[in-house]
Amino acid sequence: MKNLFLFCRAGFEKECAAEIQQRAGELNVGGFVKANNNDAYVVYQCFEDDAADTLVKQLPLDSLIFARQMFAASDLLVDLPENDRISPIVAALSDVSKAGEVRVETPDTNEAKELSAFCRKFTVPLRQHLKKSGSLLAQENPKRPIIHVCFIGPGRAYVGYSYSNNSSPHFMGIPRLKMAADAPSRSSLKLDEAFGQFVPKEEQEERIRSGMNSVDLGACPGGWTYQLVRRGMFVSAVDNGPMDEKLMETGQVKHYREDGFRFEPQRKNIYWLVCDMVEKPARVAELIEAWAINGWFKEAIFNLKLPMKSRYKEVTAILETMQTILKENGVSDFKVQCKHLYHDRDEVTVHLWLRPNTAWN
């Protein structure tokens, strides 16, 4: 297959396109992008047949900022007959053998999601035919490739596969999180999603545990503080504004009515630093850099608000500058990840982990 299909948020196709063009080039996989505004997907068409397999194997999905999910894809199947959509799809997947799962999806747009009921019903007979053809195993297997069938409109679909070790575990790349009734704001879901995105399940018990000390800069009214409290942490909530009363009643939160840019922790035993402030992204990055250089935290999750134009260029420039500044100031052992999360809008979420191979005292 020569196409790479990438899911993204509607309105961010240009950013996703610019990113995959650059990243594919770094792997010497030439091609060009096909993208339309508000389609919520991008297709990277490789010049060489089967080059998409190189990308789904060698380009880590977690290293892409704007793509939620990706798969090696066929050319667009069009005019699928209403009386037999299955046969052309099975034929297009003839080179896929012994996959462990099939997902029938749509892009994340209101128009495409009108097909979601059809996709659910269609999955059952399609699964049976794929098992008969040998493209799909009789039993689901999480270690085998995943077959993707993405309907972008009635009778129009891209089909292909991803590898389970380089694929989102979520349908359409979207985690299904529930808004807690007592959470102070919807922003709470951003940190909840970020923990799932940046900290593997098997490491969460060690790295996100009860009793840890944390700081929330720009905490009011407490959406992110809520997620820290829910996980049993003690939180220094820094904001001139008021905090949610129920959060304060837990006894786990100490409210500092201060400017988040001027606050300095009294004790240097902070594991998690979180920050979701409506500020210029470069200024927030400088703040996190200062905390990192001072060694005031172990892991940080923070949001960078995106400009209206050149969003990919701006984000990559800020992240490159951050890494340069940290290294110039003696902080050389760290890991940075960045993702445009489902619950993000005009922002991206960044994870910075200092000394990832060194235990926390």
UniProtKB/Swiss-Prot annotation:
Catalytic activity as recorded in UniProt: cytidine(2498) in 23S rRNA + S-adenosyl-L-methionine = 2'-O-methylcytidine(2498) in 23S rRNA + S-adenosyl-L-homocysteine + H(+)
Superkingdom assignment: Bacteria
Enzyme class: transferase
Record has Acyltransferase as a keyword: no
Positions contributing to S-adenosyl-L-methionine binding: 187, 220-223, 239, 259, 276
GO molecular function: S-adenosylmethionine-dependent methyltransferase activity
InterPro entries per record: RlmM_FDX, RlmM_THUMP-like, RNA_MeTrfase_FtsJ_dom, rRNA_MeTrfase_M, SAM-dependent_MTases_sf
Localization (cell): Cytoplasm
SUPFAM superfamilies, sorted: S-adenosyl-L-methionine-dependent methyltransferases
Protein name: Ribosomal RNA large subunit methyltransferase M
Organism: Shewanella baltica (strain OS185)
Lineage: Bacteria, Pseudomonadati, Pseudomonadota, Gammaproteobacteria, Alteromonadales
Gene name linked to the record: rlmM
